[in-house]
């Protein structure tokens, strides 16, 4: 009996333990974490755009609505690209050649960004009118343009602008009047049609003197002491040739703007100009639009290749601009891929930005421009003394046109012309 009672007690104890083990354990909750207080840092508003006023000068054609308002269009795009600035542009008319005079004479009133000719670089730098490019601005110029164009904005080792386009000239002609073979000879052309040449303009009439060995500051254009040499027997021979050409009724003395008007009226079959009138000329001639390098001319009984000048049109920044960062970036924009592309499409300006140059090789104007620069053109360097040439050259051209210069006084007139080209006239 005692054994039975002991067994019953043991069984009760086991059942009690089992019952206790089956109880649901207390829930272990993750400690309640209070939601962190909302982070409310002070809201930092974007800084207000900095107000900037920039004066920008360019030729009237670049601001003409009928020609696409290149300058205004590209400046507006630049403004939109830079929300950090609120730019007010003040536009003025100034040709590339006039910049050398208008900028230095009143630096306070002058444009912050302006177009200039590389031939005037010495004048502008010697008057401290141009800002020198450095840092990333300098690298952009060095890396995105042909070296020949970079050289155009270098003076005394510094870079003073952005190349915008080449500046040379060639011949536009009507293919229904002249063949590709005809346009190699001025004499042949004059037998078949009317040819306009801007004889009263040194930029163009120098082509005849250069054809017969004239030099501007030495053979390579870098010898200041050599001066301008277009006199002597060779220079006189050119003057005689020009007298004969002017006597030909098919040789028309006319500036490009007048020549294209005459072509539109059917009174001119070929004329000399640069890229800036390509689109209008193509519109006039249609499928008969022809482009060629300058022809050969007969000088002293020999066929001589006419040789044009070449240089660059550039974009500069005033050295005293109140907003150098904005002005430098605008100059790079106006000379960069997008702006050069727009200039090419609107006005036929030949690109000199490397990437864009590779994209326009199918354009005959671009090809002839490149061929001209490579094969026959003579570089114009930036010596200030070059400026002595223009007025005497204009006068010489006018006097030949008007018959003041004759075969009888050609030698005397040519020598006087040469002396005037080497004298400031002061």
What is the meaning of each model-derived region?
Residues 77, 81-144, 160-161, 269-270, ...:
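Extracytoplasmic "Venus flytrap"/periplasmic binding protein-like
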Residues 224-255:
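Glycine-centered hinge/linker elements that transmit conformational signals in sensory
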